[in-house]
């Protein structure tokens, strides 16, 4: 009788452990795959653009649809390239730095809070820049990808907000 009770407790603990691990894995994957959708709906202060940041940070997880004139690079540095006629703009992420090459040929280095740290022209001379204009150009580059993000089957917006609220405010 004693062995049966111990075996029952052991089996119950194993089943409980697998259930908790499975739910944790599902939650992690859900938050990664749907991070761009959740970031679109999180309250944030002006100028932070959490949807663009989440798209770049989780590009390996997020939905990246085939869209005309947009290509993706995910080997080494995550990047999104958008061709508009003869003009090309590129937004890339390497480590903690966002890199944006505008269609006009100017290059910008941004931190993960989406603020410009350095700006250069095509000859690598420092240039003056307008933060809002740069952010608008970046948004134009990636907006079709952001618009294509599907709604999650199980919405964990509350958990995403809990985790990322302090970062985007």
Task: Name what the model sees in each region.
Residues 1-4:
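Positively charged n-region of N-terminal signal peptides that target proteins for export
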């Amino acid at each position: 009788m004693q062995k049966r009770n111990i075996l029952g407790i052991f089996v119950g603990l194993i089943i409980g452990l697998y259930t908790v691990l499975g739910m944790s894995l599902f939650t992690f994957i859900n938050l990664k795959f749907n991070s761009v959708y959740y970031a679109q709906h999180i309250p944030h202060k002006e100028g932070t653009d959490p949807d663009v940041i989440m798209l770049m940070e989780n590009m390996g997880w997020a939905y990246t649809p085939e869209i005309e004139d947009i290509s993706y690079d995910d080997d080494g540095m995550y990047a999104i390239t958008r061709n508009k006629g003869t003009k090309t703009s590129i937004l890339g992420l390497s480590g903690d730095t966002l890199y944006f090459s505008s269609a006009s040929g100017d290059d910008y280095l941004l931190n993960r809070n989406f603020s410009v740290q350095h700006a250069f022209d095509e000859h690598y001379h420092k240039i003056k820049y307008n933060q809002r204009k740069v952010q608008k150009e970046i948004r134009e580059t990636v907006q079709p990808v952001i618009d294509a993000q599907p709604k999650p089957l199980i919405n964990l917006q509350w958990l995403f907000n809990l985790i990322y609220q302090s970062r985007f405010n």
